[in-house]
Amino acid sequence: MSGSTERQRVKPRREPHSGPVAGVIFDMDGTLVDSGLDFAVMRREMGLPDGVPLLETMENLAEAEAIRCRAILLRHEAAGAARAVVLSGVRRFLDRLRGLGVRQAVFTRNSREVADATLTRCRLDFELVMTRDDGPIKPDPWAIRHICATWGVVPAQVAVIGDYRFDIEAGIRAGARTVLFTRGRPSESLPGADLAEFHLASFQQADQLLRALGL
């Protein structure tokens, strides 16, 4: 899991994709489910500066400090998985995609154990779930490319939906369509808003997005 990709400048797409999508790849926390994770609290407990990416920062810590911080992270993630709830409109949106023959996957910076526990609790089932235990983490595009290769499609045939810039940056680097899920928040205040091809405020109001994705 390398943080080097994150430091590279990502430019927004100037030319929108065309044609219907064959698959949609979702972020998990904050997009499909609300697990109440507070990364600012985690950073304070770990003694890390505000705003730094947790996983990449922990890679560069001394072994004893990294072990301590990982234990804090896992404790918060496990608590989040135990209280996770599906966000409004998500089930209906997934059902609509399924009815249209659109494949669905998840990519997350969570561990395999936590991702599986979260999705099981929320009764969400996906064909593929890629976690930090499987390979390079977003904003690296590896997981998106792996999913596309498994599906036998090119990234331009999929849309990536997430609530943070790492999701959007990974999608752009892979060559996928990108959708920032704003959850009703002012988009100008959200990291990645200037990069995303589309913005989505609510899964309950996704008709326009589906049309934009050729569905």
Whereabouts are the PLM-identified features?
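Alpha-helix N-cap/helix-start and coil->helix boundary motif
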Residues: F39-A40, L87, S111-E113, R165
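Metal-dependent phosphoesterase signature
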Residues: L61-D95, L100-V102
